[in-house]
């Protein structure tokens, strides 16, 4: 088997986790208590969904996941919620005191005490796997736990499981909506380590997803539940080929191989289509070509940045439902002829496609329409540098006055770490700029007409 362990950190990560596991259970027909009426071979671990669930002898299905927070309230909601019987109690770990939006508390003082316990749980889960493929880490980098403890945990995972892939689903601070004053500090400090310790990081931001909810689903005042269910659809589409059988299955390591041209340039954008409410879906065709075009719309991107301002280096299109390769090839060919969608000149093909026959599942009482087919795109575009530029600018404004820095230093962090992280991000912006530059200009001295 190719198992995957999910790690949900901090409030953001845990709440996305709730939405994801709710959706996985619906997709596989697993009841909230872990039983699965449709599973005939009890205790036999060769079903495709065993990548995400382990089976006990009694036929109960337990998620291969760890929920971790430094304060108890959010984990307690899982302990008392609908799916309380699904998880093993040891998989829900909570501390006593909060990271208080402070990266240094999550990374140095409070996080240090809990990280060994968490690694111990992860080791137990890993021992239970026959062929562990990698980790999915879910966290927000604006707060203290997701950024500080997230960094600590990813660093330790790199040491213990060096060769395994690590995919991060990272919620970045939005341009307009802010949940904490010190967000820019936390996210810059955390990104500094995401550069080294994740293989692919999918960027999400709340504001972009709010806009999608308002515009496409006609939800006037979207809640976090609306947002998380949308994110869960994306994550479910990315992992569908690991959990179901399909025509063109895509492995987790394939994302890496196809999306990451240089190790540092691994921050990717995601989009999903069709995102429409049930009323609208009734009147629309939603062919493969249509949903493919929709996935490339700047408005569909789940992070606030405009892909028209940059160039694509690569993109993965994951189709699910009633889709045949012929339609996919036709719609990809159409995309390639569009002037608005630019690829870098050193990457001529640029597309990786996956097809899975399992149609998208919707949560009962949710906002999305039940559709025959859907596509999820993750793309590596130079436009993502906009996100970093925005955060860096806010960081600079605060750091020039050394505002709030004493809270971090007081928790045992050195001030030099701020400037080191900031320089690393400046270098990252520069990297993106160079990657997007015309390659002919760079090699101006050499004779270009070699081939």
Curated annotation (Swiss-Prot):
The record marks 451 as: Involved in polymerization. Its cofactor is Mg(2+). It catalyses: GTP + H2O = GDP + phosphate + H(+). It comes from the Eukaryota. The modification N6-acetyllysine is found at residue 40. CDD domains: alpha_tubulin (cd02186). This is Tubulin alpha chain. It comes from Euglena gracilis.
């Amino acid at each position: 088997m190719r198992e995957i362990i999910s790690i949900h950190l901090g409030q953001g990560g845990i709440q996305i986790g709730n939405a994801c596991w709710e959706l996985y259970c619906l997709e596989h027909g697993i009841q909230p208590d872990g039983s699965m009426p449709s599973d005939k071979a009890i205790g036999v671990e060769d079903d495709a969904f065993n990548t995400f669930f382990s089976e006990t002898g009694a036929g109960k299905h337990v998620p291969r996941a760890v929920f971790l927070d430094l304060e108890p309230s959010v984990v307690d909601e899982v302990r008392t919620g609908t799916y309380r019987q699904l998880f093993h109690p040891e998989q829900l770990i909570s501390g006593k005191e909060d990271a208080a939006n402070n990266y240094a508390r999550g990374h140095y003082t409070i996080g240090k005490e809990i990280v060994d316990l968490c690694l111990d749980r992860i080791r137990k889960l890993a021992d239970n796997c026959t062929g562990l493929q990698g980790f999915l880490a879910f966290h927000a980098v604006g707060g203290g736990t997701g950024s500080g403890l997230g960094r600590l945990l990813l660093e330790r995972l790199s040491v213990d499981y060096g060769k395994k892939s690590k995919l991060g689903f990272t919620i970045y601070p939005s341009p307009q909506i802010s949940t904490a004053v010190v967000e820019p500090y936390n996210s810059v400090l955390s990104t500094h380590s995401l550069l080294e310790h994740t293989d692919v990081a999918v960027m999400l931001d709340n504001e972009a997803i709010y806009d999608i909810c308002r515009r496409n689903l006609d939800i006037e005042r979207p809640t976090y539940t609306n947002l998380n269910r949308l994110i869960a659809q994306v994550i479910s589409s990315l992992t569908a080929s690991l959990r179901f059988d399909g025509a063109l299955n895509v492995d987790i390591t394939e994302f890496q191989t196809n999306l990451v041209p240089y190790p540092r340039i691994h921050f990717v954008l995601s989009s999903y289509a069709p995102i429409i409410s049930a009323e609208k879906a009734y009147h629309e065709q939603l062919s493969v070509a249509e949903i493919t075009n929709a996935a490339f719309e700047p408005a569909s991107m789940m992070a606030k940045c405009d892909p028209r301002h940059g160039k694509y280096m690569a993109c993965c299109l994951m189709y699910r439902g009633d889709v045949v390769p012929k339609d996919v090839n036709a719609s990809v060919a159409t995309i390639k002829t569009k002037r608005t969608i630019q690829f870098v000149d050193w990457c001529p093909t640029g597309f990786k496609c996956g097809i899975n026959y399992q149609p998208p599942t919707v949560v009962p009482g949710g906002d999305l329409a039940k559709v025959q087919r859907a596509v999820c795109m993750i793309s590596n575009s130079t436009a993502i540098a906009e996100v970093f530029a925005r955060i860096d600018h806010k960081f600079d404004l605060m750091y020039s006055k050394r505002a709030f820095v004493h809270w971090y230093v007081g928790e045992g962090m050195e001030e030099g770490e701020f400037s080191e992280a900031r320089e690393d991000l400046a270098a990252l912006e520069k990297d993106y700029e160079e990657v997007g530059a015309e390659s002919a200009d760079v090699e101006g001295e050499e004779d270009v007409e070699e081939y």
